[in-house]
Amino acid sequence: MNPIVINRLQRKLGYTFNHQELLQQALTHRSASSKHNERLEFLGDSILSFVIANALYHRFPRVDEGDMSRMRATLVRGNTLAELAREFDLGECLRLGPGELKSGGFRRESILADTVEALIGGVFLDSNIQTVEQLILNWYKTRLDEISPGDKQKDPKTRLQEYLQGRHLPLPSYLVVQVRGEAHDQEFTIHCQVSGLSEPVVGTGSSRRKAEQAAAEQALKKLELE
């Protein structure tokens, strides 16, 4: 991989790996090599959840568990991680197999989100929990400063349903229109039909649930509720 690109990525991350092989593995999708990033992703997912939960616990001493859970879900969900990945220009650094390259995997939200989690796992193994915690807090500083308890933190499907129910409109319908990839690495495409919108909105995700949430979020944007 181009060392100039890698060095630029590490500057954007705010961390230089002592063991570059961990960085290479974190950037490697299953389609490219047997030494891929899924174990690092598993580790990073748990670390991210802990760090964000800990930050919210101390920032909001009077907020109940339900609101903290919703805020955490907002901060660690796939599209938030994909936003971070785009801020890092992560797509240009991914190691993908020929099929994923051809289908635009470097832009796919689920792959970008998974790679951010893998990088977190890699940084932890390369350093320690204190270092990776501070790094995550640096990445999330603006988002943590801006987030607040309340209805806005409910997941998109819940907010869309409550909006429609409040206006005595039919509930949205979700239809799976495409499933791509093998069992271990699928991408679902969902059409969401909503009263008040002339055409279905589209959502994609690595599971049906995530795709439905993505579609609901797009519907909320079209209804100008986001």
Swiss-Prot record:
* Cofactor entry: Mg(2+)
According to its UniProt record, this protein's enzyme class is hydrolase
Any Pfam family the entry gives = Ribonucleas_3_3
Looking at the record, the residues that make up the DRBM domain are 155-225
Q: What is its main location?
A: cytoplasm
Q: Which GO terms describe its molecular function?
A: double-stranded RNA binding; metal ion binding; ribonuclease III activity; rRNA binding
Q: Name one GO cellular component term.
A: cytosol
GO BP term, pick one = rRNA processing
Record-linked SUPFAM superfamilies: dsRNA-binding domain-like (SSF54768), RNase III domain-like (SSF69065)
The question of whether Chaperone is a record keyword is answered with no
State which Enzyme Commission number(s) the record gives.
Answer: 3.1.26.3
| Catalytic activity annotation | Endonucleolytic cleavage to 5'-phosphomonoester
Phenotype of gene-disrupted mutants: Accumulation of full-length 23S rRNA as well as larger precursor rRNA transcripts. Strain grows slower than wild-type.
Alphabetically sorted, this entry's keywords are: Cytoplasm, Endonuclease, Hydrolase, Magnesium, Metal-binding, mRNA processing, Nuclease, RNA-binding, rRNA processing, rRNA-binding, tRNA processing
- Compartment annotation: Cytoplasm
Q: Which residues bind Mg(2+)?
A: E41, D114, E117
The record's annotation in CDD domains points to: DSRM_RNAse_III_family, RIBOc
Location of the active site: D45, E117
> What family, per the record?
Belongs to the ribonuclease III family.
Description of how the protein assembles with itself and partners = Homodimer.
PANTHER family in the cross-refs: RIBONUCLEASE 3 (PTHR11207:SF0), RIBONUCLEASE III (PTHR11207)
- Extra info from the record? This organism contains small helical (90-110 nucleotide) intervening sequences (IVSs) in all 7 23S rRNA genes at either the 550-bp or 1170-bp positions or both, accumulating the 23S rRNA as 2.4, 1.7, 1.6, 0.7, and 0.5 kb pieces.
Q: What does this protein do?
A: Digests double-stranded RNA. Involved in the processing of ribosomal RNA transcript to yield the immediate precursors to the large and small rRNAs (23S and 16S). Removes small helical intervening sequences (IVSs) from all 7 of the 23S rRNA transcripts. Probably also processes some mRNAs, and tRNAs when they are encoded in the rRNA operon. Probably processes pre-crRNA and tracrRNA of type II CRISPR loci if present in the organism.
Name of the protein this chain belongs to: Ribonuclease 3
Q: Which organism is it from?
A: Salmonella typhimurium (strain LT2 / SGSC1412 / ATCC 700720)
Mind giving the lineage of the organism this protein is from? Bacteria, Pseudomonadati, Pseudomonadota, Gammaproteobacteria, Enterobacterales
